[in-house]
A protein has these predicted regions:
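A conserved beta-strand-to-alpha-helix junction within the catalytic ATP-binding
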Residues: 1-14
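Conserved micro-motifs of the catalytic ATP-binding
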Residues: 34-39
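Short helix-loop "hinge" at the ATP-lid/N-box region of the Bergerat-fold HATPase_c
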Residues: 55-56
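Acidic ATP/Mg2+-coordinating residue in the GHKL
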Residues: 83
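Short conserved segment of the HATPase_c
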Residues: 88-100
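Short alpha-helical Gxxx[C/S/T] motif in the catalytic ATP-binding
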Residues: 115, 119
Length: 150
């Protein structure tokens, strides 16, 4: 069950950013289901942590980041991280997963451009897929990982 792994990372980030920048990170499991995948626990933690770090980095103070877990119609497990930041400027969002690529504005500080590349490599390791898009009808970005059925 990946829920305890995700909740642990969300709690860690809330402990840091709730007081530091008043950013609320919410975990959503609408169906209250258990979600099982074949995966390496510390790598799943790293995926979620890197996605949250990226989402928080692009978020203004007093905003929300949402981590949602669900199942697709064909029972694949989906982890979706959404922020209320500026969204993606790139038409081809696959660019953001390239090594050393960064579109981070200076006001958000410098980063190596490796975080999302590491996520992509770990997602590939789990035979999963990842896609990035701008949120529909509101400001922000959405990154979705779809894990195969165990």
């Amino acid at each position: 069950d990946i829920e305890p792994i995700i909740k642990s990372v969300v709690d860690d980030f809330n402990n840091i950013y709730k007081l530091k920048r008043w950013i609320q990170i919410s975990y959503v499991n609408d169906k209250k289901n258990k979600y099982f995948i074949n995966g390496i626990e510390n790598r799943i933690e790293q995926i979620v942590a890197n996605l949250l770090d990226n989402a928080v980095s692009f978020s203004e103070d007093n905003k929300e980041v949402i981590v949602k877990v669900s199942k697709s119609k064909d029972n694949k497990v989906i982890i979706n991280v959404q922020d209320e930041g500026e969204g993606f400027k790139e038409k081809d969002t696959n660019k953001i997963f390239k090594r050393f690529y960064s579109n981070r504005p200076d006001k958000f500080g410098q980063h190596s451009g490796l975080g999302l590349n590491i996520v992509k490599n770990l997602v590939d390791l789990h035979n999963a897929t990842i896609k990035a898009s701008n949120r529909i009808n509101q400001k922000g970005a959405s990154i979705e990982i779809i894990f195969p059925i165990p």
